[in-house]
Amino acid sequence: MFKRTVILLAGPTGSGKTAVSLKLAPLVDGEIISVDSMQVYQGMDIGTAKVSLTDRKEVPHHLIDVCHVQESFNAVDFYYHAVQACQDILSRNKVPILVGGTGFYFHTFLSGPPSGPSPDFVLREQLTLEAQERGISALYQELELLDPVYAATITKHDKNKIIRALEIIRKTGSKVSSYAWQSTVNESKEYHCRRWLLSPDPELLRHNILERCDQMLEEGLLDEVQALLAAGIKGNSSASRAIGYREWIEFLDLGSPPDLFEITKQKFITNTWRYTKKQRTWFKRYSLFRELRPMGMTLDDMAKKIAQDYFLCG
């Protein structure tokens, strides 16, 4: 089977992957697919370092602002959205460039989502009627009792996912969370993937993170968190626990005490750095990503290197 080529550009927070991708896209006539578990949410802009609207006009981006903060979005959702975006981009003879730092999403894109039982439309209809009669909150409470692990990954507003989960449980007697993911990353069955990992020196990465956190606060992160609280972000456990949001949600809930500002800021920086180290560990676990060390290279240099590889192998 002939496979179309796509580019994967991964890296930890603060590695410069967004800046490189904006240089790369014009070189290969590409469009960018965000591989970030939080950039899918509307209103989570500053804290997720979303690319600016100006840059999005220059280079089309996909999988940004696709859902409300009260909705859940997981790796399975990402897989189907990303495949659809790839097909759309390729149909216009453009090059998909998947860019981000959510390793599990890259894993899912390469290996596919976990398998599950086939749909039972009769049972689904019964559950839909139950939702109308009892309310979707009652079904969510039932799911929390039967499969608390999976229930914690969605919200009480996710009607379709709640019904599908209960459908699986009632049909098979097994928890949704028991369906295992692939433990290894494989070659995508759909695409020929050129995989790159930006891997800056740890000291440079730490410096970038310090600057990044300061810049987010200067750009109005606290105002953004306040707006998200009004929009109901607490109804989504994943979004409200995201680094850069959970620290400041707690700060605002306490009444924004001035004496806790610096403590909260340091917690924000520390948590970001810890997450970055986890990202680096995750990506280096898989030899399928080719490391690109920025030392001595400009953004243009890195973009050209990836583009040359694409044209040689694409």
Curated annotation (Swiss-Prot):
Cofactor field: Mg(2+)
EC number: 2.5.1.75
Record: residues binding ATP: G11, P12, T13, G14, S15, G16, K17, T18
Site, Interaction with substrate tRNA: residue positions: T102, R124
Annotated residues for binding of substrate: T13, G14, S15, G16, K17, T18
Region described as Interaction with substrate tRNA: spans on this chain: 36-39
GO BP annotations, alphabetical order: tRNA modification
Gene Ontology MF term list: ATP binding; tRNA dimethylallyltransferase activity
Keywords: ATP-binding, Magnesium, Nucleotide-binding, Transferase, tRNA processing
Top-level taxon in the UniProt lineage: Bacteria
Reactions listed under catalytic activity: adenosine(37) in tRNA + dimethylallyl diphosphate = N(6)-dimethylallyladenosine(37) in tRNA + diphosphate
NCBIfam families: miaA
Quaternary assembly: Monomer.
HAMAP family: IPP_trans (MF_00185)
Family statement drawn from the similarity comment of this UniProt entry: Belongs to the IPP transferase family.
Function: Catalyzes the transfer of a dimethylallyl group onto the adenine at position 37 in tRNAs that read codons beginning with uridine, leading to the formation of N6-(dimethylallyl)adenosine (i(6)A).
This protein's name: tRNA dimethylallyltransferase
The gene coding this protein: miaA
